[in-house]
């Protein structure tokens, strides 16, 4: 998981608007999210990872232990249960179950890029972060 550790800046995204709308997020909030251009810092201590996301909308810090379910707040302010598992040293899968949906996010580090594939129902989006 050391490949994830460090700072990452927003690169680009594909189909994120459709993904956010599928989650039921309002058009106004979708526009704000798409223009936020977040930066991330990943830290790792043993089997526990912390992801700090800083954007023009807010700062969010999420700490979790791989393989253990935890409660978190979604982008639209709802409570959801999430589990993150290690697939390899450079790949992790996040499954989040909220009141109306289940999402999957697969993050993989390839060179100096982190590719995240977001899925809800039949809608997929991809975001790319660049090593800062």
Curated annotation (Swiss-Prot):
Where are the N-acetylalanine modifications?
2
> Is Secreted tagged as a keyword?
no
- Which keywords does the record carry? Acetylation, Lipid-binding, Transport
Under the heading InterPro entries, the entry gives: Calycin (IPR012674), Fatty_acid-bd (IPR000463), ILBP (IPR031259), Lipocln_cytosolic_FA-bd_dom (IPR000566)
**Highest taxon above the source species:** Eukaryota
Indicate whether Cell inner membrane appears among the record's keywords.
Answer: no
- State any single GO MF term: lipid binding
Per UniProt, what is one Pfam family of this protein? Lipocalin
Please report which protein family the annotation says this sequence is part of: Belongs to the calycin superfamily. Fatty-acid binding protein (FABP) family.
Full protein name? Fatty acid-binding protein 1
Q: Supply the source organism for this entry.
A: Fasciola gigantica (Giant liver fluke)
UniProt gene name: FABP-1
